[in-house]
Swiss-Prot record:
Key word Nucleus present: no
Family, as annotated: Belongs to the AIM11 family.
Recorded name of the encoding gene: AIM11
Superkingdom to which the source organism belongs: Eukaryota
Cross-referenced PANTHER family: ALTERED INHERITANCE OF MITOCHONDRIA PROTEIN 11
Gene Ontology annotations for the cellular component aspect, listed alphabetically: membrane; mitochondrion
Entry protein name: Altered inheritance of mitochondria protein 11
Organism this protein belongs to: Saccharomyces cerevisiae (strain YJM789)
Major localisation: membrane
UniProt topology in membrane: Multi-pass membrane protein
Membrane spanning residue stretches: 20-37, 66-88
């Protein structure tokens, strides 16, 4: 019983750390995006023309926008998923699938065998081994 409480507390702390890490990543990314937008703003001085655009590289701007947008979406969705997992005490991918289906109104029993193809089962096993090795550290 005491071991179960320690294990649950350890799991909850790990879930909390993942959520706060994802939230911090999202906030830092949004701050960088805000700063990048402010830097690109063109404010002409009193004798400068206001219709002349400053020189810039379209390729660099596109790469910067793609990087910022990707980081913002990854941060937002990871915060959402880790928060969902923390709130519902989900620690494995299998639990996540069952809770998500239950949340969406598709109840499924834990005993039913969800068959996976060979590649998916290998990938799932690798991910669970990676997560379990993080828990052991």
């Amino acid at each position: 019983m005491i071991e179960e409480k320690k294990e649950r507390k350890k799991r909850r702390v790990l879930q909390m750390a993942r959520f706060y890490g994802a939230a911090a990543f999202t906030l830092i990314t949004m701050r960088l995006i805000s700063r990048a937008i402010k830097v690109r703003k063109y404010v002409p001085s009193i004798f400068q023309q206001n219709y002349k655009l400053p020189p810039f590289s379209q390729r660099n701007e596109a790469m910067s926008a793609l990087t910022y947008a990707s980081a913002a979406s990854i941060g937002t969705f990871s915060t959402l998923i880790f928060g969902f997992c923390w709130a519902l005490d989900i620690s494995t991918a299998r639990e996540f699938v069952f809770k998500t289906r239950e949340f969406m109104g598709v109840p499924q029993a834990l005993e039913t065998d969800t068959s996976m193809d060979e590649e998916t089962s290998k990938l799932t096993k690798q991910l669970q081994d990676l997560l379990s090795s993080e828990n052991n550290k």
